[in-house]
Amino acid sequence: MATRTQAREAVIGMLYAYDLGNESIIEIARSMLEEKKIKNKQQDFAFSLLQGVIEHLSQIDLCIAPYLKEWEFSRLGGMERAMLRLGAFEILYTETDTPVIINEAVELGKMYGGEDNAPRFINGVLDALSKAHTKNKKSEDCSKTQDIINDALGKES
């Protein structure tokens, strides 16, 4: 039986493919998960993560952007983008404990991050996002979280 870590690992691979232009990934996701021996509850979990990230992609990117410091989102490695998007989705839209989410993202960063400092970078971005989001836990979108972010950065909404 697959673990949630393996499910997340499969999801970042599919998000990477989606980011490269394979927009039909959602249609073949279940068969890809089957091939990776991710079945039943873990398959449902993985599929819901993939579907959720894709559905909320623009909001997720908007929420991540302020924490990239000098980096532009488009200049990040594809796998780093996928890991940040998955982690941000889970922080913003699920009930999973934040330390679990961040730890999973960091561990995936150690395996798949293109840079040696990818795990540290992922940890910093997701931790900062989670702290801002905690101030507005029930936000359906990132608008209130974005207001908090802008306030912290001294920007106008």
UniProtKB/Swiss-Prot annotation:
Gene3D superfamilies: NusB-like. InterPro entries: NusB-like_sf (IPR035926), NusB_fam (IPR011605), NusB_RsmB_TIM44 (IPR006027). GO terms for cellular component: cytosol. Keywords: RNA-binding, Transcription, Transcription antitermination, Transcription regulation. SUPFAM superfamilies: NusB-like. One of its GO terms (molecular function) is RNA binding. Disulfide bonds: none annotated. One of its GO terms (biological process) is DNA-templated transcription termination. It comes from the Bacteria. Involved in transcription antitermination. Required for transcription of ribosomal RNA (rRNA) genes. Binds specifically to the boxA antiterminator sequence of the ribosomal RNA (rrn) operons. NCBIfam families: nusB. PANTHER family: ANTITERMINATION NUSB DOMAIN-CONTAINING PROTEIN, N UTILIZATION SUBSTANCE PROTEIN B-RELATED. Belongs to the NusB family. This is Transcription antitermination protein NusB.
